[in-house]
Amino acid sequence: VAAAQALREIERLACWSVKQANLTTSLLGDLLDDVTSIRHAVLQNRAAIDFLLLAHGHGCEDIAGMCCFNLSDHSESIQKKFQLMKEHVNKIGVDSDPIGSWLRGLFGGIGEWAVHLLKGLLLGLVVILLLVVCLPCLLQFVSSSIRKMIDNSLGYREERKKFQEAYKQPERVV
């Protein structure tokens, strides 16, 4: 019962984490789009300022801090990380056949028919082992129970005979 509850809790947490990862990815994607549009607007404004300065005969040297302008772009690495995050989210799931997965991992790329065959053989082996372990105990229990029933039955018959003999009235001759 505790294992089933723990499994349900793990499934619930996995579902919750997938939903949170999807929401986070969506939110960060929207923020990246906003940053990209803001970056584009800043670059357009900088180009307009440079154009106006040049139109009035001034260069960037005339105003302190206007010559150096660094606006880094990390959108490509962020997109790669989004893709990686989505791949990890897609890997989250419930394994409905843990024994089959274990066998596939153990024996490599075996076919489904081989997995079913190995699962059947494994089940048969477990049943045989259980019989080998439990059968002697079960036979001893049944044997002792039958012996007790027979002893009780024989003891009851002997007691009955003794009782009848003890209370047997002599026959009257008429």
UniProtKB/Swiss-Prot annotation:
InterPro entries: TLV/ENV_coat_polyprotein. The keyword Transferase does not apply. GO terms for biological process: fusion of virus membrane with host plasma membrane; symbiont entry into host cell; virion attachment to host cell. GO terms for cellular component: host cell plasma membrane; membrane; viral envelope; virion membrane. Residues 4-54, 72-102 form a coiled coil. The chain crosses the membrane at residues 122-142. SUPFAM superfamilies: Virus ectodomain. Keywords: Cleavage on pair of basic residues, Coiled coil, Disulfide bond, Fusion of virus membrane with host cell membrane, Fusion of virus membrane with host membrane, Glycoprotein, Host cell membrane, Host membrane, Host-virus interaction, Lipoprotein, Membrane, Palmitate, Transmembrane, Transmembrane helix, Viral attachment to host cell, Viral envelope protein, Viral penetration into host cytoplasm, Virion, Virus entry into host cell. Disulfide bonds join C60-C67. Belongs to the Alpharetroviruses envelope glycoprotein family. This is Envelope glycoprotein.
